[in-house]
Swiss-Prot record:
Compartment annotation: Cytoplasm
Class in the EC hierarchy, top level: hydrolase
Gene symbol of the encoding locus: clpP2
Major site of localization recorded for this protein: cytoplasm
Protein name stated in the entry: ATP-dependent Clp protease proteolytic subunit 2
Entry GO CC: cytoplasm; endopeptidase Clp complex
Catalytic activity: Hydrolysis of proteins to small peptides in the presence of ATP and magnesium. alpha-casein is the usual test substrate. In the absence of ATP, only oligopeptides shorter than five residues are hydrolyzed (such as succinyl-Leu-Tyr-|-NHMec, and Leu-Tyr-Leu-|-Tyr-Trp, in which cleavage of the -Tyr-|-Leu- and -Tyr-|-Trp bonds also occurs)
Highest taxon, organism lineage: Bacteria
Length: 203
């Protein structure tokens, strides 16, 4: 039987009454966001809006982005990536479970020194996926060129975020490349492996 989104009690500031809200709304009040599904335009728009709001509300406090995602749309993921870089708030990225493909890219995009993973997390990087249907040869050629352009852009960004060379990133992402949390730290995708919430925001 499917499990619905849990609700938890929440008392608005200044109110003596509690109301029930979904758990993600409650976590958002604490500046905790969760990417727990495939990256698509809907989830990207939601996360972008939440980050912009939290940043405008108080950019002196960090935003915590928990990631357990198989990846997904490159364009949707880049919208989240650009917003992480755009906001003034530090963005603490935390891998729980799996950060694969665009999920790994967003994990590495967090504020340097504040990219972390739990001990049994898995991280996977690879080149962007692309496919063609029955279309004109000229359209297929255009799409192929765009995929290669995006691949180079992602690899350059990943090299910058990890400290690895462009050539190593290009070689490692030619196929699915899985890393443990400790291996991801050594690779430069994250800064620390943590076991307690208090460790997440340490530089």
């Amino acid at each position: 039987m499917p499990i619905g989104t849990p609700s938890v009690p929440y008392r608005l500031p200044g109110s003596q009454y509690e109301r029930w809200v979904d758990i993600y709304t409650r976590l958002g009040v604490e500046r905790i966001l969760f990417l727990g599904q495939e990256v698509n335009d809907g989830i990207a728009n939601s996360l972008v809006a939440q980050m912009l709001y939290l940043d405008s509300d108080d950019n002196s406090k960090p935003i915590y982005l928990y990631i357990n995602s198989p990846g997904g749309s490159v364009t949707a993921g880049l919208a989240i990536y650009d917003t992480i870089k755009y906001v003034k708030s530090d963005v603490v990225t935390i891998c729980v479970g799996l950060a694969a493909s665009m999920g790994a890219f967003l994990l590495a995009a967090g504020t340097k020194g504040k990219r972390v993973a739990l001990p049994h997390s898995r991280i996977m990087i690879h080149q962007p996926l692309g496919g063609t249907s029955q279309r004109q040869a000229s359209d297929i050629e255009i799409e192929a060129k765009e995929i290669l352009r995006i691949k180079d852009m992602l690899n350059m960004s990943m090299a910058d975020m990890t400290g690895q060379s462009f050539e190593k990133i290009e070689k490692d992402t030619d196929r699915d490349y899985f890393l443990s949390a400790e291996e991801a730290k050594n690779y430069g995708l994250i800064d620390r492996v943590i076991t307690h919430p208090s460790e997440a925001n340490q530089s």
